[in-house]
Swiss-Prot record:
Its EC number is 1.1.1.17. The keyword NAD applies. GO terms for biological process: mannitol catabolic process. GO terms for cellular component: cytosol. Signal peptide: none annotated. It comes from Streptococcus pneumoniae serotype 2 (strain D39 / NCTC 7466). This is Mannitol-1-phosphate 5-dehydrogenase. NCBIfam families: PRK02318.1-3 (NF002647), PRK02318.2-5 (NF002652). It is an enzyme of class 1 (oxidoreductase). NAD(+) binds at residues 4-15. The lineage of its organism: Bacteria, Bacillati, Bacillota, Bacilli, Lactobacillales. GO terms for molecular function: mannitol-1-phosphate 5-dehydrogenase activity. PANTHER family: ALTRONATE OXIDOREDUCTASE-RELATED (PTHR30524:SF0), MANNITOL-1-PHOSPHATE 5-DEHYDROGENASE (PTHR30524). PROSITE patterns: MANNITOL_DHGENASE.
Length: 378
């Protein structure tokens, strides 16, 4: 049986990446620091996924195990030494924390003389995630390890898309996911092109697909949350049931479409259909997706290269409309949740400093005209 190492045994890891790896015949070693999840994986050796749609069918994922990377790093290194593929779903901010362990695993392959080519795919909500991870891993590799990695270890970027809401069940491994999923891998950085996963798309140039996903799904989802929160909605479905909010989300997606078409020459009709499907996904009555989950960490989401500021910058450069995105940015700056550290910090910054200074600090912008435009909406 083929072997995989997956960093991140959370809902997305189990409910999306784990399902695909299982369907492709892999044994999966989930690596995490959550002892409860790791213990359950080792005790049961399987878990169930429920598809959030009419009929609510279930998939049993078997041949799984767990490794606590904090308590047993040597087991992770041993697994990496022998594995056929490595994936992650831990969040962009956590990638640097697994780099040293990954480097040790690569060094172990080198010392063992394992020259079987291996690909490492960071399945995160970020542009260039795998290459970012590689830059972090390189900091811990010896000169010999660097040469070995360049020859035998690939870090192809990936774009992933599936809504997996925050949830809690008596069975800690059980996870509910939406029916839709998309996983796209760039081919130009693959070291093992012969290992093709079914239900995964492969593209020579991944950037258009990553931007289509991030600027459509992530921007649209966050827009639903921030506008929804402003109007008192508790879930994304509740937000979409308000015609005013839905209309605003559609207006944001129309601006995103104009950017994607101008930049990547996407077919207008196909992109309209893609965005229509996104709205339908947000309206899935079988998913309870809390506004608080989607809106959390607003400081990160208002970053220079993130889901709002980047498309706004690029639309401005192309002299295209971004008014609706600006309005959403205003709602994001106004968002407060006592349980979200970043939203509280944002409120404190706005209370202590000039709004303009906070906008510059949070967004990283130096375009004075754009800064002033954002200030008008806060």
């Amino acid at each position: 049986m083929k072997h995989s190492v997956h960093f991140g045994a959370g809902n997305i890891g189990r409910g999306f990446i784990g399902e695909i790896l299982f369907k492709n015949g892999f044994h999966i070693d989930f690596v995490d620091v959550n002892n409860q999840i790791i213990h359950a994986l080792n005790e049961k050796g399987k878990y169930e996924i429920e598809i959030a749609q009419k009929g609510q069918s279930r998939i049993e994922v078997t041949n799984v195990a767990g490794i606590n990377s904090k308590e047993h790093p040597e087991q992770v290194i041993e697994a990496i030494q022998k594995t056929d593929i490595i994936t992650t779903a831990i969040g962009p901010n956590i990638l640097p924390f697994i780099a040293e362990l990954l480097a040790k695993g690569i060094e172990a392959r080198r010392v063992a003389g394992n020259t079987q080519v291996l690909d490492v795919m960071a399945c995160e909500n970020m542009i260039g995630g795998s290459q970012f991870l590689y830059q972090e891993v390189k900091k811990y590799l010896s000169p010999e390890g660097l040469t070995f990695a360049d020859n035998y270890i690939g870090f192809p970027n990936a774009a992933v898309d599936r809504i997996v809401p925050a949830q809690s069940h008596e069975d800690s491994l059980f996870v509910v996911v939406e029916p839709f999923n998309e996983w796209v891998v760039e081919t130009k950085r693959l070291k093992n092109p012969d290992l093709r996963l079914k239900d995964v798309h492969y593209e020579e140039d991944l950037e258009p697909f990553i931007e289509r996903k991030l600027f459509s799904v992530n921007s649209g989802h966050a827009t639903s949350a921030y506008i929804g929160a402003h109007y008192g909605a508790k879930t994304i479905l509740e937000a979409l049931q308000n015609p005013n909010i839905k209309s605003r989300i559609e207006s944001v997606l129309a601006e995103i479409r104009s950017l994607l078409i101008a930049k990547w020459n996407f077919d207008k009709k196909e992109l309209e259909n893609y965005h229509k499907v996104i709205i339908e996904r947000f309206e899935n009555p079988f998913i309870v997706d809390e506004v608080s989950r989607v809106a959390r960490t607003p400081i990160r989401k208002l970053g220079y290269n993130e889901r709002f500021i980047r498309p706004i910058r690029e639309l401005k450069e192309l002299s295209l409309s971004y008014k609706n995105l600006l309005k959403t940015v205003g709602y994001a700056f106004d968002y407060r949740d006592v349980n979200d550290e970043e939203s509280i910090r944002l409120g404190e910054l706005l209370a202590k400093q000039l709004v303009k200074d906070v906008v510059i600090q949070v967004t990283g912008l130096d375009d004075q005209e754009l800064i002033e435009q954002i200030v008008e909406y806060i």
